[in-house]
Amino acid sequence: MTKFIFVTGGVVSSLGKGIAAASIAAILESRGLNVTMLKLDPYINVDPGTMSPFQHGEVFVTDDGAETDLDLGHYERFIDSTMTRRNSFSTGQVYENVIAKERRGDYLGGTVQVIPHITDEIKRRIHEGAAGYDVAIVEIGGTVGDIESLPFLEAIRQMRSQLGRNNTLFAHLSYVPYIAAAGEIKTKPTQHTVKEMLSIGLQPDILICRMDRTMPADERRKIALFCNVEERAIVGSYDVDSIYECPEMLHDQGIDNIITEQLQLNVQQADLTAWKKIVHAIQNPKHTVKIAMVGKYVDLTESYKSLIEALKHAGVHTETDVQITFVDSESIEKNNGDVSMLKDMDAILVPGGFGSRGVEGKIAAVRYARENNVPYLGICLGMQIALIEYARDVAGLKGANSTEFDLKCAAPVVALIDEWQTADGSVETRDESADLGGTMRLGAQEVELKAGSLAAKIYGSEHIRERHRHRYEVNNNYVPTLEQAGLVIGGVSAGRERLVETIELPNHPWFFACQFHPEFTSNPRKGHPLFTAFVKAALNNKKA
């Protein structure tokens, strides 16, 4: 039978529930358990696919093509399980399914209510996502007390009642502030958030206290007394330099022993050797490189979370401190294409994105990298930008652009593809008037790499599988012209469309761009060959 750990948060948002939950999962996995994770989002959006990065941060794409919360990226980076669409759902999806059942007559004319119909659907989805695992860690988005979260909290209350204390555990993350003016740690916010939980029938078994300093024994005893939680189950979650220090930090306080005792799990001792090696590599780099990330969401770096982490993973595997400088592509445009801020950079990266804002600034950055032999990595839109720049400045295709930015451009080298084959062999179609939500090329797709290409050398194979999230493709009608001008198409999709997947420049020290998102499959234990190769190229450029 699957055991459930429910992780909730109180006082304020953005305390790090996802990291805490993922760290617990990593510890339990190191003890030999088969662990999965679920994220329950209270918003009414069906998924975050159409939400602004400034509102939501990064959209993480699962292997099977679900657009999900960035916390699922943390889950995959901390444990070995691959997330799917079953590992994430929102209020919007729950209501959508319940209403569809009502329309079909599944409820036999009954009045459809939050209890039991909505809560039953939530429980069904939790059990579905947890099936086949020893332990499922379920993170409830939002903050206890929010009206949006109430159906989810009621659902897990019912699960505790139905499954019992030895099969369920509540871990609550709270904020314990230090008031500098008074020189005191304040426990009252934590007392109040637990009071809020108790009012809806939830008693925390573990309290994880988010703090910027070690918790004194007196405060620990006080919280235990007022919150009715064992003193040893008051666990500190302190500020650290790297999120990968968190599993060891929580383990050292015995959190996994508390969990295994309550859930009656007879398992081996934790082995965090791999995590200790990762932390040691992060703390003791032998080299340093500076990489410019040129994008338009740079004011909220959470928009590029997986990408930032993938570069850090590459640093772990090359003993390098990867220092990222975020460059606003709009500022380059406003300053007439001035890219002087790139001159001290060892490499340049242009990430994915949508819309025309800041595009010409990105094109200027690509031009600088190409003309000055600076290692360049383009991802998704970053590949399309590189291709547009090459078409304009090398292939002589004046007016080259993407129809995403200029529907009537003279040379649409990037355009909306209206039909393509999915990974399971079915055919999907779209046009300019199609809904934005769920209409992109999503999830893992097979890619064929050209023998002898830089792509094949990086991956060590001519057949790879990478995740996608995009609506526009390279226009194959222009490929012959671009190839004649020296551009190398190093990879194409395995389907009948032969869509361009990677491009490279043979006469450049290291110039590579891909349509897919390799950052979604990078983790600190293994890294990713593309990012490792990119950081090595930056190191070589620095030495040169």
Curated annotation (Swiss-Prot):
Q: Which InterPro entries match?
A: Class_I_gatase-like (IPR029062), CTP_synthase (IPR004468), CTP_synthase_N (IPR017456), GATASE (IPR017926), GATase1_CTP_Synthase (IPR033828), P-loop_NTPase (IPR027417)
Its Enzyme Commission number? 6.3.4.2
UniProt-annotated stretches for the region Amidoligase domain:
1-265
Matches recorded under PROSITE patterns: GATASE_TYPE_1
Q: Name one GO cellular component term.
A: cytosol
| Keyword rRNA-binding (UniProt) | no
GO molecular function annotation = ATP binding; CTP synthase activity; glutaminase activity; identical protein binding; metal ion binding
Give binding positions for ATP.
S14, L15, G16, K17, G18, I19, D71
- Which residues hold L-glutamine? G353, L381, G382, M383, Q384, E404, R471
- Pathway it works in: Pyrimidine metabolism; CTP biosynthesis via de novo pathway; CTP from UDP: step 2/2
Q: How is its activity regulated?
A: Allosterically activated by GTP, when glutamine is the substrate; GTP has no effect on the reaction when ammonia is the substrate. The allosteric effector GTP functions by stabilizing the protein conformation that binds the tetrahedral intermediate(s) formed during glutamine hydrolysis. Inhibited by the product CTP, via allosteric rather than competitive inhibition.
Catalytic positions? C380, H517, E519
* Binding, Mg(2+): D71, E139
Q: Which UniProt keywords apply?
A: ATP-binding, Glutamine amidotransferase, Ligase, Magnesium, Metal-binding, Nucleotide-binding, Pyrimidine biosynthesis
Instruction: Tell me the ranges covered by the Glutamine amidotransferase type-1 domain, including all copies.
Output: 290-544
The answer to whether UniProt assigns keyword Magnesium to this entry is yes
What's this chain's function? Answer: Catalyzes the ATP-dependent amination of UTP to CTP with either L-glutamine or ammonia as the source of nitrogen. Regulates intracellular CTP levels through interactions with the four ribonucleotide triphosphates.
- Quaternary structure? Homotetramer.
What else the UniProt entry mentions is: CTPSs have evolved a hybrid strategy for distinguishing between UTP and CTP. The overlapping regions of the product feedback inhibitory and substrate sites recognize a common feature in both compounds, the triphosphate moiety. To differentiate isosteric substrate and product pyrimidine rings, an additional pocket far from the expected kinase/ligase catalytic site, specifically recognizes the cytosine and ribose portions of the product inhibitor.
Q: Which family does it belong to?
A: Belongs to the CTP synthase family.
What this protein is called in its record is: CTP synthase
